[in-house]
Each structure stands twice: as structure tokens, then as C-alpha cells.
């Protein structure tokens, strides 16, 4: 070892491989791939952006709040968690914004953070609560907007969500543990630990087609990849916070789902990098008849 040098793990991907997909965004946290062939992102003043894979940016709607995570249905409607409004809002392709879910049973959403659909159109939502208070929870919203608490015991700032292969479990980032847990969706069962980090703040998650889990860390500025045996590899790292600047959410995009797009809350752009293994396809349910 070189004298005076502290070694660290070598990332799998050099930062030079990352490119800017889109810039001029207002500190984007959420990013999602739509069934219409566009990338979607949000801004901290409520902006909703529709972005071509060539980088063309259009702001097509505004929630008026602070957009965190987002996903889409089969009719290209965007479902966005707005932490300032305390709601999951739905934005049509033409830009009309309405409330989809704000809580149930006398329990309002406190800090809605990330939504993900299953094949049946159930929308799972993380409600992070307040940092350090352990008051977060998971919700499930049925097609049409009626929701209920799914778990009260995933409370340590639940954040990014990813539906597991086969749809039998939900992987949940618990940012203040910090780590990732697996929540069974069929028949109840115990919450299981996927990985526990040290001195990191994980934020977003996404599966690839081989079942490996990509985890973006808000701090330090890293992306990790976890295999099916729970072994973690450093995928990318940016100690200068220029390419990956507080990376929050990430999504596999493009026609073949081989373009990994990363939102950098600390700056004004979306980054992208090509990967060898495509992402796991998402669900885009048709909800028009029940909404």
C-alpha cells in the first residue's frame, strides 16, 4: 500500500462512462421510465418533466409542491409523491393534476416518498415520516384510490421501493437504519434484512433482469449492486459530487432497459450509463375503468 494513502473499494464503473441525459432540471429526486418511451422526473418546486431519450426536456405539469418518487400507469398517467402536499397526485399526459391518495382511516400521509405498481394495479407507497423519529409506514392503495396501511413495522424512514421478481415481495430502503429490507406481500410474514450499510444514506432501488438490486445512496454519492446472495459491490462512486450529486432515485430506461438513469438531487441533471444486463420490466396497469 502506498504510504499515506487510504485505500477504498474500486467501483465497477468509471465515472467517465456516465453521460448527461438531461440538464436544467430543478434538483430532481425521482426518475421513472414510461411505457410511452419517455423518461419522467420531478423538481423541487413541483415540476413534472417528460424527457426524450435524446435529452429533450418538456415540463408538462406542476403539482405546486415538492416531487419525490414517481411511477406511471398504462395510460401514461404519472403518479407522484409530493412531500409538501402530503399526497400522491396523478398527472395526466396533458398536465391535469389531481389528488390520488392522501391517507385513510384518519391517518394522513406525512411524507410520501416513493410509489410502485404491481400487476393488479395496487400502488405501494412509502411514507417516510420524520427523519430520526421512526414513524414511517408502508401503504397499499387499491385501484381507484382506496388505501390502507400495509405495514407499521417498516418505520425507519422507508424510502425507495422495488417490487421483487415474481411480485411476491417488496424491497424497501430504510434510510435511517441504514439498509434495505424485504417485505413479503403474500400471506404476511416477517420483514427480512437484505443488507445493512454503515455510514451511508441509501435512497433508491431498482432490480435488473438477473434479480440484482441497485441501490443509490444520497450520502456518500455512490451506487451499490447487491446480488442474490446478499453480496454487495460498489457500482459507481463520485466523491466530488459532480456526476453523481446526492443520487436519489434510479431507473432502467430505454427500449431495451439497458440505460440506467440516475437523478441527482444535489444538482440539475439526470445522468445515464449503459449496462450489460437490462432492468427488470415494471408494471403499467390500466386503471381508467376503476379510477
Named regions from a protein language model:
Residues 47-49, 87-89, 136-139, 179-181, ...:
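A short loop-to-beta-strand structural motif that recurs across blades of beta-propeller domains
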Residues 17-22, 55-61, 97-106, 146-152, ...:
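A short beta-strand motif characteristic of beta-propeller blades
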Residues 1-16, 36, 44-45, 127:
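Blade/loop signatures of beta-propeller domains
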Residues 40-59:
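Beta-propeller domains
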Residues 247-291:
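Blade-level signature of beta-propeller repeat domains, shared across WD40, Kelch, NHL, RCC1
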Residues 51-56, 92-96, 141-145, 184-188, ...:
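Short loop/turn segments that connect beta-strands within beta-propeller blades
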Residues 43, 52, 83, 92, ...:
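Structural signature of WD-repeat beta-propellers
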Residues 23-36, 43-45, 63-82, 87, ...:
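Beta-rich, blade/repeat-based domains predominating
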Amino acid at each position: 500500500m502506498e504510504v499515506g494513502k487510504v485505500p477504498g473499494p474500486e467501483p465497477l464503473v468509471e465515472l467517465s462512462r456516465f453521460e448527461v441525459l438531461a440538464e436544467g432540471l430543478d434538483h430532481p429526486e425521482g426518475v421513472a421510465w414510461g411505457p410511452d418511451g419517455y423518461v419522467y422526473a420531478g423538481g423541487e418546486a413541483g415540476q413534472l418533466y417528460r424527457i426524450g431519450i435524446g435529452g429533450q426536456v418538456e415540463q408538462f405539469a406542476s403539482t405546486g409542491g415538492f416531487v419525490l418518487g414517481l411511477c406511471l400507469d398504462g395510460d401514461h398517467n404519472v403518479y407522484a409523491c409530493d412531500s409538501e402536499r402530503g399526497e400522491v397526485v396523478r398527472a395526466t399526459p396533458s398536465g391535469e393534476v389531481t389528488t390520488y391518495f392522501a391517507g385513510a382511516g384518519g391517518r394522513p400521509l406525512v411524507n410520501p416518498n416513493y410509489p410502485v405498481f404491481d400487476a393488479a394495479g395496487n400502488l405501494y407507497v412509502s411514507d417516510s415520516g420524520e427523519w430520526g423519529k421512526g414513524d414511517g409506514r408502508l401503504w397499499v392503495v387499491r385501484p381507484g384510490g382506496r388505501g390502507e396501511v400495509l405495514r407499521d413495522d417498516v418505520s425507519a424512514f422507508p424510502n425507495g421501493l422495488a417490487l421483487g421478481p415474481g411480485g411476491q415481495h417488496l424491497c424497501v430502503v430504510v434510510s435511517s437504519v441504514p439498509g434495505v429490507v424485504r417485505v413479503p406481500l403474500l400471506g404476511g410474514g416477517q420483514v427480512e434484512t437484505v443488507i445493512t450499510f454503515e455510514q451511508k444514506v441509501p435512497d433508491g432501488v431498482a432490480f435488473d433482469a438477473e434479480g440484482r438490486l441497485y441501490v443509490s445512496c444520497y450520502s456518500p454519492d455512490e451506487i451499490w449492486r447487491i446480488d442474490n446472495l446478499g453480496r454487495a459491490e460498489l457500482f459507481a462512486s463520485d466523491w466530488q459530487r459532480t456526476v453523481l450529486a446526492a443520487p436519489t432515485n434510479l431507473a432502467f430506461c430505454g427500449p431495451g432497459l439497458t440505460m440506467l438513469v440516475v437523478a441527482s438531487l444535489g444538482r440539475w441533471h439526470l445522468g445515464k450509463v449503459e449496462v450489460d444486463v437490462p432492468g427488470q420490466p415494471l408494471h403499467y396497469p390500466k386503471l381508467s375503468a376503476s379510477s
